[in-house]
Amino acid sequence: MEENEIQYGKITAAGEAGHRGREQEMKENGVIQEYTGSLSRQIREEYHISEEYYHGEIKRGLRNSDGTGVMVGVTKVGSVQGYLLQDGQRIPIPGRLYYRGIELNDIVEAHRAEGTFGFEEVAYLLLMGYLPSQGELRHFNEIMNRARKLPEGFTEGMIMRRTSGNIMNELGRSILSLYSYDPDPDDLSVDNLLRQSVELIGYFPSIVANAYAVKRHHFGGESLHIHYPEEGLSTAENFLRMIRPDKSYTEEEAHLLDMMLMLHAEHGGGNNSTFVCRALSSSGTDTYSAIAGAVGSLKGPLHGGANAKVVSMHEDIRAHVSNWEDEDEVAAYLGKILDKQAFDGTGLIYGMGHAVYTLSDPR
């Protein structure tokens, strides 16, 4: 019997069994929502802090008053360069991104020229501090083949039960639950932290792919296909294979995804989600709690979740701009967004601008 047929029966049975319970919960939630909704205006007024109190050394959003980032630590892992400081003034320069002192563009171009996959090499570089030899990379790939296999029963017991429909939430709660599958989750020795890190790098694509399949089935009414990772394939190839019902993908797709994985593997250690992870880790908490917190941060629309906001914003603009060729009409609606009169009322145009990069983004 096909693996997807086995899983299909389980998820369908679970969905039918929990339907009536969810209806009752929705009714109870409605009563609570009605109560809290009646108090929301008072709460907004009570917690509002006037702009006049933001002065001195108060840092808003990890930003200095001149727009530069707040120094939160020192790292040898990644470096981001987007401007120079001269006499207290920012001088824009073309953006550059370095992994362990190596310019990322050089790594990407080398793999593109050779037609090879580079994410695994980049992961090794970021973890260990140096580029692996051929033998070291081959051994690391063998370990990754093992790490991609989720614990027995994890997909059925965790991912298929009570799916939320949001992949980032599914990833976060799945990471937390992996604590229960770890024989030594609270050991903070370097040996154990490295083991957990390698396993999580392997687990992530499988968790996301399976959560995506369950989401399409549960909320989209599509047939459920759960595919196991295949040994000998790269992370990019395996992910594409697992999210497609027929396991098909092209070489171009795989190399494009591999390049994206390399480009987003590290970004200087000062972004919101990495900062959250470092703050949690500094308390001595376990790896799974720290990484799950980082994923929660990454989900936010002012961080990684901006991707989803860009899509929503485009849909909103399409609905309100009758002629895409009319630059004045497009500009007028963008002005409404900036003036907080349209879209989500935040005054933000998502996907534009960066806190560090000025002239260009090397990614």
Where are these predicted regions, by residue range?
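Hydrophobic alpha-helical bundle cores within soluble ligand-binding/oligomerization subdomains
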Residues: 2-363
